[in-house]
């Protein structure tokens, strides 16, 4: 039987994943004196941070403008009140939010500010203050682009084309500790295995996108929570996934102005026939239906509490019934108004709630058709789809209720260290995100988590040397062999020396 071949490398810190959280962790490590840092990634242009967004992708931070008083404790209370968030983690996310945000400002993420230097916020969902801020639909993409530039300037070692297969562990008293990563270098003509010994592993693989059939996650995002669970890391809040309305030809959240301009919801049979405005069957009058559509703009995630009294999340249930139970197709049509909004064939704004009417009036969006209102309110929203060969002025947009974010994940302490010592899950893979937390907190949590993990490593493990090949094989040889046995294509590849 032949001997299994693999490469071996050592690094003080291995970071698995190259989204906004992982890149920021690498930068924070470098700035705190940890020079031996390696990022393992399937690709720098892959993943959720790089390839997702929304109408106005929000970053949540401590208030930094205006006269409304805010404090770290108040922000922590807001995060904690969302449910399934530990108080110490909420406090850390609030305390470090301004440091994380202004780092992004300093490296060039184009968050808007006024002439006096205030970064003026707005109220996002589940937000009692105005802590939300946005660089536009592509906030997280801008973040990753600037973070990649800074990481390269600082000399962070980035290895592309590696898929993590196993988190390697060793006994540590009654616990375990992470000692490295087994990966597949899959871009070679003949893929080869690589073992990395590490003193610390920062795990930033994002959400479990690959397990969902109907998803707004980018196709390049797969996830790696299962590897950590298999290694013995504890999970937390794993049932708390977030769902919402999204387009499926081009995967994108349909929040904000996409709803506030009051498009027409229609369903058809599988061949495009038997068209119906299906929302009419569930709402008692025009105002309740139009108000639910409007509110869906900033109440985008499905929330069972908002299904009562004809709330906005009733729309999610109705779409689910049409698509999953009735096997029909559902579309948003921006070329026409909902039938219930018409009087004598024209848009009748007197049928709107006062809130919706005031918003449309103040935004200068009182045109006749939804596409015209969208062009007035947010022309970039139209151009985004046009850049993906979808013309909202010429065709309806097919939609579904899609998995969008896992609010749960792996458990960690207030330094983002898991129950496996020297393993730090950060970003979406860490289950800190709660249930009813404000929009934009995930981006803040990812940045804060990277800073916190890097700080702990720099202050406690700076002198810790990574294990060599013999030490890794002695401690985790059986773990490596078991993974190779499962993934190798033939018996002759299943021997390990």
Predicted segments with their positions:
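Core beta-strand elements of the Rossmann-like FAD/NAD(P) dinucleotide-binding domain
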Residues: 9-11, 191-199
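Conserved small/polar residues in nucleotide/adenosyl-binding loops
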Residues: 486-493
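Conserved redox-cofactor binding core of oxidoreductases
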Residues: 100-192, 204, 248-251, 255-257, ...
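Glycine-rich FAD pyrophosphate-binding loop
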Residues: 34-50
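Glycine-rich active-site loop/strand segments that organize a redox cofactor
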Residues: 58-92
């Amino acid at each position: 039987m032949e001997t299994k071949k693999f490469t071996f490398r050592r690094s003080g810190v291995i970071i698995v994943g190259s989204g906004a959280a992982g890149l920021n962790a690498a930068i924070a490590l470098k700035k705190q004196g940890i020079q031996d840092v390696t990022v393992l990634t399937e690709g720098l242009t892959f993943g959720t941070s790089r390839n997702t967004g929304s109408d106005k992708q929000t970053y949540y931070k401590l208030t930094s403008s205006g006269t409304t008083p805010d404090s770290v404790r108040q922000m922590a209370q807001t995060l904690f009140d969302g449910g399934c968030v530990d108080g110490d983690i909420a406090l850390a996310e609030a305390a470090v939010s301004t440091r994380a945000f202004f780092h992004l400002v300093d490296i060039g993420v184009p968050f808007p500010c006024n002439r006096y230097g205030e970064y003026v916020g707005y109220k996002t969902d589940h937000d009692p203050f105005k802590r939300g801020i946005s660089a536009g639909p592509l906030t997280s993409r801008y973040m990753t682009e600037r973070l990649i530039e800074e990481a390269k300037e600082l000399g962070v070692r980035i290895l592309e084309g590696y898929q993590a297969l196993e988190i390697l562990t060793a006994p540590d008293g009654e616990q375990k500790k992470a000692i490295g990563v087994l990966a597949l270098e899959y871009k070679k003509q003949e893929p080869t295995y690589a073992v990395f010994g590490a003193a610390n592993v920062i795990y930033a693989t994002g959400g479990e996108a690959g397990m969902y059939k109907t998803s707004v996650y980018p196709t390049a995002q797969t996830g790696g929570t299962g590897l950590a669970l298999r290694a013995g890391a504890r999970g937390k809040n794993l049932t708390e996934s977030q769902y919402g309305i999204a387009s499926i030809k081009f995967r994108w959240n349909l929040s904000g102005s996409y709803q506030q301009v009051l498009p027409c919801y229609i369903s058809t049979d599988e061949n495009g026939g038997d068209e119906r405005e299906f929302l009419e069957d569930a709402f008692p009058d025009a105002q309740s239906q139009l108000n639910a559509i409007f509110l869906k703009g900033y109440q985008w995630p499905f929330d069972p509490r908002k299904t009562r009294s004809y709330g906005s999340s009733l729309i999610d249930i109705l779409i689910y019934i049409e698509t999953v139970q009735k096997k029909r197709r559902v579309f948003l049509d921006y070329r026409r108004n909902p039938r219930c909004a018409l009087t004598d064939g024209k848009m009748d704004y007197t049928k709107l709630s006062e809130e919706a009417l005031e918003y449309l009036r103040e935004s200068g969006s009182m045109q006749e058709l939804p596409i015209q209102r969208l062009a007035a309110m947010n022309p970039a929203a139209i151009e985004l789809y046009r850049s993906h060969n979808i013309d909202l002025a010429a065709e309806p947009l097919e939609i579904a209720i899609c998995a969008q974010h896992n609010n749960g994940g792996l458990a960690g302490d207030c330094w983002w260290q898991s129950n496996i010592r020297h393993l730090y899950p950060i970003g979406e893979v860490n289950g800190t995100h709660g249930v009813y937390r404000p929009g934009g907190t995930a981006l803040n949590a990812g940045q804060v988590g990277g800073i916190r993990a890097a700080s702990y490593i720099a202050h406690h493990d700076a002198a810790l040397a990574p294990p060599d090949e013999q030490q890794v094989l002695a401690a985790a040889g059986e773990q490596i062999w078991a993974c190779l046995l499962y993934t190798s294509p033939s018996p002759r590849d299943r021997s390990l020396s």
